Amino acid sequence: MQNMVILGATGSIGASTLSVISANPLAYSVYGLVANASVDKMLALCVAHKPKVAHMVDEAAAKQLRAVLPATLNIQVTTGMNDLLGLVTAAEVDTVMAAIVGAAGLVPTLEAVKAGKRVLLANKEALVMSGELFIEATKRSGAVLLPVDSEHNAIFQCLPQEVQANLGRCDLAASGISHILLTGSGGPFLRSDLATLAAMTPAQACKHPNWSMGPKISVDSATMMNKGLEFIEARWLFNTQAEQLKVVIHPQSVIHSMVQYRDGSVIAQMGNPDMRTPIAHCMAYPQRIHSGVEPLDFFKVGQLSFYEPDFERFPCLALAMDACAQGQEATTVLNAANEIAVEAFLQGQIGFTQIAKVNEACLVTVPKRPMGSIEDILALDAQTRVYARETLASIA
């Protein structure tokens, strides 16, 4: 029986994880649930899954949850960073699902790694912001790191065992690998007239053609910043050089990524676009369990298509690839700027195409600094957010 803590329990990844746990009740137990401020959702999850601990990041939300949670459930409600770090490092915890969106998930995820936990990584920002530190911490602690993002999970499944066992430290060329092909659907605006993009609304941007996701990642998919962040994540997870990584537009989202070998072989991982599949794979690895996802019906799929990315349509993708080439400072700046810009777009403060402008302005202007510690990373993140908000004020 694996005891699991779910960071981001009330989000879409959290819901999918709990669905897989419910389908395999003899193998997994919910030890802790972590959410920001969604009291009603957390209450429902506590009643359904009966964790030992329910942690609310928002202190007022924790008080509300304590007031409404039935005492008979005997669930401890906690709040504050110290309690959160205590939860993810607790001796009783075997596995941590790291699914808090954005920079907020970095510190607890890194602490789980340092504690040597089995970490299922759905928070791509952890590697985007702290790639080298994160990989080094994994190496020192002996933590097991498994990628949940559908693309990175697909790549992982297509790799030989010696690479799977050495994430972040592997040598792709020595294993006969020539390229990693990172696929992306192109989002809801793949075929939209370029002249119409500036007027696209948050509701339109969040209407992904294939995947069911939260608002932030949905907007990132529409700008293809999500693919850019995944490009950076892949660089750290698989220890790649820039020339070993390629982005391929694949509108059907059936092939989740591919690995090309020296002998001309290409191995692809395929399946219906449902996050329960990669989640179940990570939870059970190296075994396989029931995920609740219907198997792929090739006769219904009909055809698969592939295109090169259009950087005029997707400037955020180009910015992310450039930042990856520049290094850790640039990717930290880009991530922070993008979080501020996307939130402003979702709140109607800026237009869709202005997201890329905010990101570019921060990349050009925010002074870079040495990144030797988590404190350095968080300081640069905070500095970038201040500048991004100033940039918003100037263009709003």
From Swiss-Prot:
- The primary gene name is dxr
PANTHER family under this entry?
1-DEOXY-D-XYLULOSE 5-PHOSPHATE REDUCTOISOMERASE (PTHR30525), 1-DEOXY-D-XYLULOSE 5-PHOSPHATE REDUCTOISOMERASE, CHLOROPLASTIC (PTHR30525:SF0)
Q: Which residues bind 1-deoxy-D-xylulose 5-phosphate?
A: K124, S150, E151, S185, H208, S221, N226, K227, E230
InterPro entries, from UniProt? DXP_reductoisomerase (IPR003821), DXP_reductoisomerase_C (IPR013644), DXP_reductoisomerase_N (IPR013512), DXPR_C (IPR026877), DXPR_C_sf (IPR036169), NAD(P)-bd_dom_sf (IPR036291)
Question: What EC number(s) has UniProt assigned to this enzyme?
Answer: 1.1.1.267
Which GO terms of the molecular function aspect are on file? 1-deoxy-D-xylulose-5-phosphate reductoisomerase activity; manganese ion binding; NADPH binding
UniProt catalytic activity: 2-C-methyl-D-erythritol 4-phosphate + NADP(+) = 1-deoxy-D-xylulose 5-phosphate + NADPH + H(+)
Protein name, please?
1-deoxy-D-xylulose 5-phosphate reductoisomerase
The UniProt family comment states: Belongs to the DXR family.
Species annotation: Shewanella baltica (strain OS223)
The keyword Metal-binding appears for this protein: yes
Respond yes or no to whether keyword Oxidoreductase is given for this record: yes
